[in-house]
Amino acid sequence: MEVILLERIGRLGQMGETVKVKDGYARNFLLPQGKALRANEANKKKFEGQRAQLEAQNLERKNEAQAVAEKLNGESFIVVRSAGETGQLYGSVSTRDIADIISANGFTLHRNQVELNHPIKAIGLHEVSISLHPEVQVQVTVNIARSTEEAERQAKGEDLTSIEAIYGIEEQPLSEEVFDEEDEAEDQA
């Protein structure tokens, strides 16, 4: 099916372009959400009449998104989750969790704006891309840790999956003298 795009859609085209898409994608997503019109003569005339208004609305949304992007870009958000000793989470952190944390910090964000290729399943610092508008994207850091204290240590660059971080001990072997003394004690017994 051919449709006229009413806004820029990633991997599809710019506003005003006529593109061919699968029927199901057009009927179930583009047309119901008002992102496109069927490409026929009546709709082409209708679009040309509304083009200036649609471009003005798009520019306004883009400017709002850029204002939010200036505040949000480079921010760091802490997510506290329970995890095993090796840093593997019991569960995962999904787009919904990230959107909820960012929204709790005063930003309006929907989970479909968070771009995450796969759920996060380990503690650490993770870069996440947020799409505020088809033309405006920002990067935020999500700090996933077992506690806020660990999150602060992680933010300073400490690796919390090492043995020292897990058990609070240094990884130095015992000297040979300790073993010699134990052997002598066993021989005397």
From Swiss-Prot:
Gene Ontology cellular-component annotations: ribonucleoprotein complex; ribosome
GO annotation terms (biological process): translation
Keywords carried by this UniProt record: Ribonucleoprotein, Ribosomal protein, RNA-binding, rRNA-binding
UniProt KW Ubl conjugation keyword: no
Keyword Iron-sulfur: no
One of the record's GO molecular function terms: rRNA binding
SUPFAM superfamilies, sorted: L9 N-domain-like (SSF55658), Ribosomal protein L9 C-domain (SSF55653)
InterPro entries according to UniProt: Ribosomal_bL9, Ribosomal_bL9/RNase_H1_N, Ribosomal_bL9_bac/chp, Ribosomal_bL9_C, Ribosomal_bL9_C_sf, Ribosomal_bL9_N, Ribosomal_bL9_N_sf
Domain of life, per lineage: Bacteria
Family statement drawn from the similarity comment of this UniProt entry: Belongs to the bacterial ribosomal protein bL9 family.
Function in brief: Binds to the 23S rRNA.
Protein's UniProt name: Large ribosomal subunit protein bL9
Gene this chain is encoded by: rplI
